[in-house]
Regions:
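A short, structural micro-pattern
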Residues: 19-21, 41-43, 55
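Short, mixed-charge, low-aromatic patches
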Residues: 3-5, 39-46
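A short beta-strand signature
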Residues: 21-31, 45
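Acidic, low-complexity intrinsically disordered segments
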Residues: 46-97
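Short, cysteine-centered beta-strand-loop-beta hairpins and adjacent loop/turn segments enriched
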Residues: 15, 30-43
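A structural detector for beta-sheet-dominated domains
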Residues: 9-11, 28-30, 64
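Short amphipathic beta-strand and strand-loop transition segments with alternating hydrophobic
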Residues: 1-17
Length: 97
């Protein structure tokens, strides 16, 4: 999985219902034409990452088609999901609060 660009934003929780902080990632991917995920428009991931104290975890993610925002009915492989979680753990602190 090759991430070509990304954005990260802190998700405001004005009522502080959830513990910790949540961050939304939008990650553009470069997908090989032979891959099942490939679409001519391109693919991006919308991921939510949670940080509570020293602990961080990937809460959820969706694979979407660029341009249409159509939800793709695929899951990442375990290795790719770990790679996504690691990427988020390294970049969540770039969000402005």
């Amino acid at each position: 999985m090759e991430i070509t660009s990304y954005q990260v934003e802190w998700i405001r929780d004005p009522f502080q219902i959830l513990t910790g902080k949540r961050y939304e990632f939008m990650l553009d991917l470069n997908i090989d034409e032979e891959d099942d995920l490939y679409t001519p428009n391109g693919v991006y991931i919308r991921a939510v990452y949670s940080v509570d104290g020293e602990q961080g975890k990937l809460v959820t993610y969706d694979l979407l088609e660029k341009g249409t925002d159509r939800l793709l009915e695929f899951d990442l492989e375990d290795e790719e999901e770990q790679e996504l979680a690691e990427f988020c753990s390294q970049h969540w602190n770039e969000a402005e609060e």
